[in-house]
Amino acid sequence: MMLELTRHGRDSLSRPATLAAVDESAHPSVEVEVRGLSIYTHHGVTDAEQEVGQRLEFELTLDVPDCDAVLTDRVEDTVDYSEVCDIVALAATERSYRTLERLCHVVAERLMERFDCESVQVRAAKPEPPVPYPVQEAGVEVTLERSLDREPDDEDGI
């Protein structure tokens, strides 16, 4: 019999008062996260931002349904976060974008193309944005979800 674990908060796990059997054939959904990926880039609205460049901080979350790695312990059965970093770095440095929205969308599309993810969240932030006010950072988050292929609904005439 396997133990059921209950999540309390983001980082702690505890056993519930009663033990429950877990279906060993079930694959839980896994979130692969990369936080604090720092890449020097040349993105921005102003020509100066594009010429001089600046550091961007990325946060990524990939929702991996039916992740086999929970059973196999093989990196090829999940999302390799090293490869995630490579994809982000390439997308962020191969050309310049005026908006973080576009950059985040390009990164999310590439991650969805490469990995079998249900959804991808990409956040890019400028730790020192070119604004005349004291701010900790300015950032954008884009979420892409894989669409479900639906059969036309005859009742709706679609």
Where are the regions that the model predicts?
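N-terminal, polar/charged subdomain of small-to-medium soluble alpha/beta proteins
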Residues: 2-158
